[in-house]
Amino acid sequence: MLPWTALGLALSLRLALARSGAERGPPASAPRGDLMFLLDSSASVSHYEFSRVREFVGQLVAPLPLGTGALRASLVHVGSRPYTEFPFGQHSSGEAAQDAVRASAQRMGDTHTGLALVYAKEQLFAEASGARPGVPKVLVWVTDGGSSDPVGPPMQELKDLGVTVFIVSTGRGNFLELSAAASAPAEKHLHFVDVDDLHIIVQELRGSILDAMRPQQLHATEITSSGFRLAWPPLLTADSGYYVLELVPSAQPGAARRQQLPGNATDWIWAGLDPDTDYDVALVPESNVRLLRPQILRVRTRPGEAGPGASGPESGAGPAPTQLAALPAPEEAGPERIVISHARPRSLRVSWAPALGSAAALGYHVQFGPLRGGEAQRVEVPAGRNCTTLQGLAPGTAYLVTVTAAFRSGRESALSAKACTPDGPRPRPRPVPRAPTPGTASREP
């Protein structure tokens, strides 16, 4: 009976602590921040695709708790010039924002996404233009995958400001570029979905958006090739506890770095890191007053050469200077166009241009997998060839096909496209043998 008595006392003590609030975690805080939808409204999108995407954005925003001083939403169109359908703070409910999204018209014109991103940074996300300081900022870019101007540099500037970037592509575009443009990890922030299946990701994406806008959210800013700044809202005080901050390279779990910080700390700079590397960060609040869950984040440093430096406790120490990656040589230009042909229920042909010789390229990797999820497959194509036939496909299925050129310098360049196999032929009905006519003998074959 003694073990059961001890167990009962332990449970009673735990319940009493929970009722007193000593072990109770903080209540679920309402999301607060600025959410921008960047919608491809150019002529590269068909009217049908635009209507489906518009309905998708409306479904995303309808249940959101919009309101003054809380969560605000904005919609910007991508075209020859960016166009603001409605700015932050115009709508005080998700239903009103949904009605405005549904009433929006396609702008047509060129796909100047980079220009729209610069506009978003200067006119909407900048504090000088009325943006709220200290609140989470999220960008949801819905695109058909292509852009007439560079997207990488202006998108990186937004992420350096602390903007969390989600990307939804309807199946075309450069997979590597979109992965780099989205916030890390890409598997959480980048979605390739057929335009008729966008409803499948509504609930998951909305939940991810709300998680990114919680006040307790740990986030990274000032990301360079050799470091980044971590920031978080005040969760503790100097008297109520302390933080343990852990940094682990994703590919080297044994190379962890740890730092203990006082309870009144709200940021920290990690420096002296490797370029173009994923790091898993954990912020663990330790307190005897209340139980707080650890916060986990993955951050990818920018490409370039690592610079000297070490992390320091000074909030204003500043990150290491930004190292810009060298631009690829002209002869290292990757695939610029993909053509899908000879589509059969279980195969299709993929061609691309330009074709690169063995002097510049080692060859091509062609990766393909179902858009709705499934195992991806890979085919190797030697340099000098610019086509291959994909076999063993499923009838009536949409695939994402990515052609990656591997250069001798170690660089890679990729382009993605959506391909669909037709439905297979219906099986022919087997002939029913006819009964012999009365009075006649059946013939042997």
UniProtKB/Swiss-Prot annotation:
GO MF annotations, alphabetized: microfibril binding; protein homodimerization activity
Pfam families in the cross-refs: fn3 (PF00041), VWA (PF00092)
Keywords: Basement membrane, Disease variant, Disulfide bond, Extracellular matrix, Glycoprotein, Neuropathy, Phosphoprotein, Repeat, Secreted, Signal
Superkingdom, taxonomy of origin: Eukaryota
Sugar-bearing residue positions: 264
Region (Disordered): 302-325, 411-445
Main location: secreted
GO biological process: behavioral response to pain; extracellular matrix organization; protein homooligomerization
Modified residues (Phosphotyrosine): 83
SMART domains from the UniProt entry: FN3, VWA
Modification comment: N-glycosylated.
A single cellular component GO annotation: extracellular space
Gene3D superfamilies, per database record: Immunoglobulins (2.60.40.10), von Willebrand factor, type A domain (3.40.50.410)
Disease link: Neuronopathy, hereditary motor, autosomal recessive 7: An autosomal recessive, neuromyopathic disorder that manifests in childhood or adulthood with proximal and distal muscle weakness predominantly of the lower limbs. Affected individuals have difficulty climbing stairs and problems standing on the heels. Most patients have foot deformities, and some may have leg muscle atrophy. Muscle biopsy and electrophysiologic studies are consistent with both a myopathic process and an axonal motor neuropathy.
Quaternary structure annotation from Swiss-Prot or TrEMBL: Homodimer or homomultimer; disulfide-linked. Interacts with HSPG2.
Function: Promotes matrix assembly. Involved in the organization of skeletal muscles and in the formation of neuromuscular junctions.
Entry protein name: von Willebrand factor A domain-containing protein 1
